[in-house]
Amino acid sequence: MRLDKFLCDALGTTRKEATQLLKSGEVTVDDVVQKSGAFKLKETSCVEWQGREITLHGPRYIMMHKPDGVVCSHEDGFNQTALTLLDEVNIQDLHFAGRLDVDTTGLLLITDDGQWSHRVTSPKHKCEKTYRVWLADPIQADYAEQFNRGIELRGERELTLPAQLEVISETEVLLTIHEGKYHQVKRMFAALGNKVIGLHRERIGQITLDETLEPGEYRYLTEEEVASIWK
């Protein structure tokens, strides 16, 4: 394949834009700057743009440390969207595998693989999600038992699925749920007469938020992390 055709397909650029990228000297093939669009790539060629390898094949799986005040949508008239924090091409093709409220922080999964994200979010698969929760009032002695039995949410007839509560302090807990109802964690504690004042997602399935990521930073998932969702 010609190098300029590869850039058009991989980056979604026009042929003219690909030519301009090549002229900039920011494109390398196997660590050698290439400025000719006619350069023929081999199957083993490693193409980099601005020091980052670009490929044609394979969906994208991204872990982000979502900061406070950022919304999980493609467009928003008031708040910054999480997708604008990505330095990636064709971000319009990406979507969230489990959204977070604007005031909730932590692990956010982003992908363009619809089947994979469905596996994360579908109630049928009961994918575990662990949250660190800060409460306005001290927890009561029977909280863990009530969560394990299921909580009756306001406006719903069925109890939530059993959830696991780990007490960190009198106003801080880790809560693991197996479904994803609207504002579920906040509503569960509200049903017990308490109020969530801070919420941070730490884990989805076997994928745990990378401790090295600062709020707003992201990285691609490892092959093992991607595969874990199918287990």
Curated annotation (Swiss-Prot):
GO terms for cellular component: cytosol. The keyword Hydrolase does not apply. It is an enzyme of class 5 (isomerase). One of its GO terms (biological process) is enzyme-directed rRNA pseudouridine synthesis. Belongs to the pseudouridine synthase RsuA family. The keyword RNA-binding applies. SUPFAM superfamilies: Alpha-L RNA-binding motif (SSF55174), Pseudouridine synthase (SSF55120). It comes from the Bacteria. GO terms for molecular function: 16S rRNA pseudouridine(516) synthase activity; pseudouridine synthase activity; RNA binding. Pfam families: PseudoU_synth_2 (PF00849), S4 (PF01479). Its EC number is 5.4.99.19. The active site is at D101 (nucleophile). PROSITE patterns: PSI_RSU, S4. The gene is rsuA. Responsible for synthesis of pseudouridine from uracil-516 in 16S ribosomal RNA. This is Ribosomal small subunit pseudouridine synthase A. It catalyses: uridine(516) in 16S rRNA = pseudouridine(516) in 16S rRNA. SMART domains: S4. Coiled coil: none annotated. Keywords: Isomerase, RNA-binding, rRNA processing. Residues 1-67 form the S4 RNA-binding domain.
